[in-house]
């Protein structure tokens, strides 16, 4: 077994979960190369019909929280590599297979691929995120500093779902992670950051590529959405604990002080983020708790620079699923295909090149069959324009209800 795809599940809307597994199944991955491992963390919903439809392996547990669910998935995974897909998200048709190839061919411990937000009206990718806009390879003592250098500003580094990991790396850090997970009844925030930290600390070589998208869905049921004072307190408690654990477990290297400084700046970022949430939701009395949790002298609200990686966006076609279906048909075809790429975008051309490279018989010709024309609405281009989007970041306060509403619907 080459790859285990771990899907942790807890009362996710069934339609989202079905879309998640459907996207994995309808991809360039070969059936014999991977397993879908569902960790059902005590859901009250019955998902057996969806799980059976897509041939997933399921382990049911009592509700113990996402951290323990992820660790159980790592323990039970049978693949040489491991990747995570959240149960309400989806992936494009050519996401995991190229990562698997790249990792195998280059002996990577961690491989990144691109990602995009998926809202109710559109999908867009953040080109301010360096893992999307640049190519990189880090080796040896440069790996962990690469994880820390952005100080929490770039989504791709501190979440699990943008990456494929060598299974031996993740299984090797279970001894570090289990005591932390078991020290709390529910460690339900920033646990992915903690897993990534220990994984990068144990990795010798990491790199990225750009063949597809992980679609991170934004919706009202997400656990990361702050609704109550209780949830905000929980987020502060676990994020500050995560940063403290990272500080305590830095390796003794020549750049240790540099990494310490990065973690402290990350703490400053999170103190501003959570203070902004507190102010926007009338929880200003949490001032001292936030300040003490993040070990900062004073609290300030979020700055524009804190959100800079999200200000440069690229809107994806509204018909991206239709495009993916057509590209998957090319992948699955057993005959020679003549394809016209006259109106194809960069993503489509790159996908066709990848398919050809894998030995599929494709000839590019103006007379060939046309792939779907990418369609992007003018209003989406305007909304996601850097100037317009940046003004939105400035005028709509972080943590405010109107910003949460716009984030979900725009």
Predicted regions and their residues:
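Glycine-rich, basic loop-to-helix element that forms the pyrophosphate-binding segment
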Residues: 47, 61-77, 87
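Membrane-interface aromatic/basic loop that binds lipid-linked glycans or pyrophosphate carriers
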Residues: 275-410
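Short aromatic/hydrophobic "clamp" motif used to bind/position activated sugar donors
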Residues: 82
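Catalytic core of nucleotide-sugar-dependent glycosyltransferases
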Residues: 212-219, 226-254, 269-300
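A conserved acidic beta->alpha catalytic loop
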Residues: 23, 37-48
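Short, well-formed alpha-helical segments that are part of the catalytic scaffolds
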Residues: 7, 12-27
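Donor-binding/catalytic cores of nucleotide-activated saccharide
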Residues: 90-190, 194-202, 206, 214-229
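Acidic helix N-cap motif at the loop->helix transition within catalytic regions
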Residues: 44-52, 90, 94
């Amino acid at each position: 077994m080459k790859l285990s795809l771990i899907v942790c599940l807890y009362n996710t809307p069934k339609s989202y979960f079905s879309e998640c597994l459907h996207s994995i199944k309808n991809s360039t991955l070969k059936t014999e190369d991977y397993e879908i491992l569902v960790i059902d963390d005590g859901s009250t919903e019955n998902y057996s019909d969806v799980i059976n439809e897509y041939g997933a392996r399921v382990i049911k547990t009592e509700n113990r929280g996402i951290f323990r669910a992820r660790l159980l998935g790592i323990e039970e995974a049978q693949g040489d590599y491991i990747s995570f897909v959240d149960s309400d998200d989806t992936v494009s048709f050519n996401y995991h297979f190229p990562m698997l190839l790249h990792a195998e061919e280059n002996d990577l411990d961690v491989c990144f691929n691109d990602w995009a937000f998926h809202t109710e009206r559109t999908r867009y990718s953040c080109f301010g995120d360096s893992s999307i806009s640049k190519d990189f390879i880090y080796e040896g003592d440069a790996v962990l500093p690469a994880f820390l250098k952005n100080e929490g500003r770039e989504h791709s580094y501190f979440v699990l779902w943008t990456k494929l990991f060598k299974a031996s790396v993740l299984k090797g850090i279970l001894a570090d992670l289990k005591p932390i997970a078991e020290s709390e009844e529910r460690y339900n925030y920033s646990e992915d950051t903690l897993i990534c930290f220990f994984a990068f600390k144990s990795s010798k070589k990491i790199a990225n590529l750009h063949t597809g998208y992980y679609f991170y869905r934004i919706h009202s049921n997400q656990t990361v959405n702050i609704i109550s004072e209780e949830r905000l307190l929980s987020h502060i408690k676990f994020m500050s604990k995560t940063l403290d654990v990272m500080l305590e477990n830095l390796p003794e290297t020549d750049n240790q002080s540099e990494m310490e400084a990065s973690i402290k700046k990350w703490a400053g970022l999170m103190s501003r983020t959570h203070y902004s949430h507190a102010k926007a939701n009338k929880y200003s009395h949490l001032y001292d708790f936030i300040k003490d949790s993040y070990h900062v002298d004073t609290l300030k609200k979020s700055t524009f620079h804190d959100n800079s990686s999200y200000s440069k966006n690229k809107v994806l076609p509204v018909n991206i699923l239709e495009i993916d279906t057509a590209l998957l048909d090319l992948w699955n075809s057993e005959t020679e295909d003549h394809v016209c790429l006259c109106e194809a975008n960069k993503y489509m051309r790159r996908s066709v090149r990848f398919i050809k490279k894998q030995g599929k018989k494709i000839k590019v010709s103006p007379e060939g069959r046309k792939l779907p024309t990418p369609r992007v609405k003018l209003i989406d281009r305007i909304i996601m324009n850097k100037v317009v989007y940046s003004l939105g970041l400035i005028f709509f306060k972080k943590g405010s209800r109107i910003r949460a509403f716009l984030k979900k619907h725009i």
